[in-house]
């Protein structure tokens, strides 16, 4: 029954790089459609691809285009997703079969980007922040599908920790239960997206891309299921004040609850609200941390290709 070719499209550049054992870095597309306003989203996505190239790897931005999981978007496709914005379906694992069957378009979350990367054979992925356990999840059960994907899908994800709108402690507990290693890149503390500190420890602090690549290669070579989180702090000069950002996050969460916003609309609403409350400072920080993650992911992918 398996007929992957029908649903997967890999760009020639990515296909060739993988065939030659060159480093490739997967990139998500929800950040383009739902994470930032146009045209800043397109500009950021193209800059991220450029940073990956400058650090020796081939970028593979992933989305669902006309019913196919497309690994390696063209500039035109990135522009399209950026312009369409929130009109594009935010696609997680559950959405894939329906969107593919309908020949529809979708922007991939962390979970779906991991699926696309794994199907194509890409082992390293750079994003902003991963999804996790939402605040109040003990009553709402609002837990991102990203976490379950980490338990199943063999892709290393470089991020700036989980988005600080989440319950960081419970997110780490969930990842521990699922056996997912959380690596701090040059840090013993999990970064909290906009800030370098969260008060929570990572499982291991590793200080260079080569060591991270070795640990990831060991997991792959042992045939162990699931991925790896590499938490890379936002550069200090772009980090936001902890109390300032937390008070704005709390205000945004309060409004979200008051308006009854739930499910996959929650994160885009909160990020947009926080951007407005901080007069655009949070968006500027978001862009810088994504750039930093792209650089580190490319370095890890290069080291992995040498093993």
Q: Regions from the language model: what does each represent?
A:
Residues 196-221:
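Anionic-ligand binding region
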Residues 25-27, 59-64, 106, 124-129, ...:
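General beta-strand structural signal in soluble alpha/beta enzymes
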Residues 15-19, 24-25, 54, 116-119, ...:
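Solvent-exposed alpha-helices and their adjacent loops that cap or buttress functional pockets
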Residues 226-292:
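A C-terminal functional module that forms or caps the active site or interfaces directly
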Residues 39-45, 77-82, 132-151, 174:
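A glycine- and small-aliphatic-rich helix-loop capping segment at beta-alpha/alpha-beta transitions
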Residues 1-54, 119:
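N-terminal glycine-/serine-/threonine-rich phosphate-binding loop
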Residues 109, 138-151, 155-176, 210-214:
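Active-site glycine-rich loop that binds ribose-phosphate moieties when present
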């Amino acid at each position: 029954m398996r007929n992957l070719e029908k649903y997967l499209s890999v760009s020639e550049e990515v296909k060739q790089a993988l065939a030659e054992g060159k480093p490739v870095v997967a990139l998500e597309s929800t950040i383009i459609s739902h994470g930032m306003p146009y045209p800043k989203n397109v500009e950021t996505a193209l800059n991220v691809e450029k940073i990956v190239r400058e650090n020796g790897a081939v970028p593979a931005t992933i989305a669902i285009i006309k019913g196919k999981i497309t690994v390696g978007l063209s500039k035109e496709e990135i522009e399209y997703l950026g312009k369409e914005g929130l009109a594009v379906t935010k696609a997680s694992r559950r959405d894939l079969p329906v969107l593919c069957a309908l020949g529809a378009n979708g922007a991939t979350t962390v979970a779906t980007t991991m699926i696309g990367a794994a199907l194509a054979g890409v082992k390293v992925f750079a994003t902003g922040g991963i999804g996790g356990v939402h605040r109040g999840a003990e009553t709402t059960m609002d837990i991102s599908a990203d976490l379950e994907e980490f338990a199943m899908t063999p892709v290393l994800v470089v991020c700036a920790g989980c988005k600080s709108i989440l319950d960081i402690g419970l997110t780490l507990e969930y990842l521990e239960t699922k056996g997912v290693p959380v690596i701090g890149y040059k840090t013993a503390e999990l970064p909290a997206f906009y800030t370098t500190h969260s008060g929570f420890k990572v499982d291991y602090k590793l200080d260079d891309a080569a060591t991270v690549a070795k640990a990831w290669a060991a997991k792959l070579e042992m045939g162990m299921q699931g991925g790896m989180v590499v938490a890379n702090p936002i550069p200090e000069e772009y980090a936001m004040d902890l109390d300032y950002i937390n008070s704005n996050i709390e205000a945004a969460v309060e409004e979200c609850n008051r308006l009854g916003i739930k499910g996959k609309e929650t994160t885009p609403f909160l990020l947009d609200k926080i951007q407005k409350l901080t007069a655009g400072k949070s968006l500027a920080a978001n862009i810088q941390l994504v750039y930093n993650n792209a650089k580190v992911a490319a370095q890890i992918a290069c080291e992995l290709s040498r093993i």
